[in-house]
Amino acid sequence: MDQTMNETLLDACSSDKLDVAKEMIEKGADVNFKNGDGRTCLMRASKRGYEDIVDLLLENNVDVTARDKNNDTALMGAAKHGYLNICRKLVEAGSDVNAHDNSGRTSLMRAALLGETHVVEYLVEHGADMDLIDEKGRTALIDAVNAFKVDVIHYLLAKGANVNKRDNEGCTCLMRACYSGNADLIYFLLQRCADKDVVDNAGRTALQYLRNVDDEQLKQLLK
């Protein structure tokens, strides 16, 4: 097969050139062609939100489970950038909602970190495991707390995410919130049964993480 056609198809899918992509496929270009980094046409189109290109590739039996050198999938790219319709199409076509990259990062973690609430909701409703951890021991909820994504935090906790999960340093969501100095978030986590008495790997409690909060009532709650 002509490698030039494959590369032209990849370029077309990367730049939303639907007519060129159709032409290359009709001429026999490989919809599953990978570049030197292992990235595919579907990965490129999905992370850029090119829904028509994604539809074209799906119609031509593209592999939705393909991985690049980092073990990223097309779904991870779409989830990270909040492209809900593309996420739907990929999951319906067989994408694994719990697939993780070489760092243990899942589609849910990526969406949670960037506050893509609708994508988070869709993934959880379709089987995404909220308590999976990455190589640093972080869950999607810990990511959301670190990034102050309040809507995501509320949703994940309402769905039963473990508020007391500890990362590799022994830190919990409450400790991270205390370190950020976000009093509203600290109160909310305490209301959702965050354990103030958990200690990290260095023996510190949430109270010892507290910064930039002049709230005696809160300090008493954390004691």
Residue ranges with predicted function:
Residues 1-8, 126, 159, 191-195, ...:
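Ankyrin-repeat-protein effector appendages
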Residues 17-25, 50-58, 83-91, 116-124, ...:
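Ankyrin repeat structural motif
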Residues 1-27, 36-39:
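Intrinsically disordered, low-complexity regulatory segments in ankyrin-centric signaling systems
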